[in-house]
Amino acid sequence: GLFLAMGMSVDEILATSLDLNIPNFVKIRIGSFFNKFGFVDMAPIRKKLVEICGSDPSFSEIEMKIYISAFCMNTSETVYFSKDTHPDMKIIDAVCMSMAVPFIFACGKYNGETYVDGGMKEEYPLTPFFDKKPHEITCIKIKMNRMYQDDIETPKQFVETLVRSALSNRVTYETPIQVVEINVGDTNVFDFGMSYEEKIRLFNMGFTFLSA
């Protein structure tokens, strides 16, 4: 959503995604967990996003309206950031907070409050669109197979298993919207060293589902 809002084409987004060497800026650091409650520091990720976008705009500085959700730990509520509510906020700050899967990525701070991935509570970020007609809303859902973890012996295995369990117990809505479900099977979405071939396979899978 960020890249589309910044005016990038789908082809440009794909090329950028395939060229990214994620382990160069997504590094697991024990110290980050104790300081920011997540093993992966978001600062290098934020820097890379600014580099890709070519700028670091606020919500009010781009033409397209984009909503970015993050879950506020202080209030136990999902907050939707946009030019209507937070015009002076840097969009990439909101994106980093929305990426902050608990324990894996460092949590975000904004106006003294702590934020994590909005998807930890809601399966779909629908709240800003409740006034729309059902046929005007399309949600893309990534579905993973339930995985049995033979041995949980490392912090990484424990956190991944915990997060997968949390994602299977999120709030869902009965709103009759169009849902495109993309089943990625046993793919490990937390594999930061994913190969070029695996990225292509996932892209083709998503393209096939959306074209059906």
Residue ranges of predicted features:
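Patatin-like phospholipase
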Residues: L2-A212
